[in-house]
């Protein structure tokens, strides 16, 4: 453990409760103070202030707390298995979780309250605004969503939604797919089966509005 130093270097483990700009460890770094970079073979954890985390398996940044000042989530988290942070602009891993905002997430599983770009097998959250590309997309927002299945059951979606199956409670814009469904639609559906439950025509092949 160290209360403050310019560098922590260890073959196994580093722990700090003070300001340590750089932590390098073979296995794990843990810090509760100010940290610029954490680099570890297995994992990193920062409780309050960190800018960059790189690990072989996983990274954990500060938990988002509305009433707590002085928190600095990492600008970037890079790992093979999983990244978690309250608010991280860039995350690349098999699974990524950013509780609040994220600019870019790349992984098999991506979760964010408000994301701009999500690329993965499963993406969830609100696109605000941006692009979501995956096998399954869930959430709200827009303007571009592309997947096998776009399933949006909370909030309004808008823009262009393309997939084999598009489902939205409320959609403003274009739905392009084999099966399109919307409770409320301000736009057009193009596909084999188009359902606009509250529209003039509930079900139409080809095009519905």
What are these regions (language model features)?
Residues 1-209:
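Surface-exposed, glycine- and small/polar-enriched segments that build interaction surfaces at terminal
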């Amino acid at each position: 453990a160290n209360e403050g130093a310019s560098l922590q270097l260890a073959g196994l483990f580093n722990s700090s409760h003070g300001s340590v700009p750089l932590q390098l460890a073979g296995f794990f770094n843990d810090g509760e103070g100010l940290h610029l970079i954490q680099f570890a073979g297995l994992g990193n954890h920062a409780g309050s202030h960190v800018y960059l985390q790189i690990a072989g398996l996983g990274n954990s940044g500060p938990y988002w707390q509305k009433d707590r000042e002085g928190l600095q989530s990492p600008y970037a988290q890079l790992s093979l298995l999983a990244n978690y942070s309250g608010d991280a602009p860039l995350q690349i891993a098999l699974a990524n979780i950013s509780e609040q905002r994220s600019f870019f997430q790349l992984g098999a599983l991506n979760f964010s309250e408000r994301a701009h770009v999500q690329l993965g097998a499963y993406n969830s959250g609100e696109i605000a605004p941006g692009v979501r590309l995956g096998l399954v997309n869930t959430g709200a927002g827009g303007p571009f969503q592309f997947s096998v299945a776009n399933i949006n059951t909370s909030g309004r979606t808008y823009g262009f939604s393309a997939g084999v199956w598009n489902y939205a409670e409320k959609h403003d814009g274009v739905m392009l797919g084999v099966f399109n469904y919307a409770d409320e639609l301000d736009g057009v559906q193009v596909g084999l089966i188009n359902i606009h439950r509250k529209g003039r025509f509930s079900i139409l092949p080809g095009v519905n509005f």
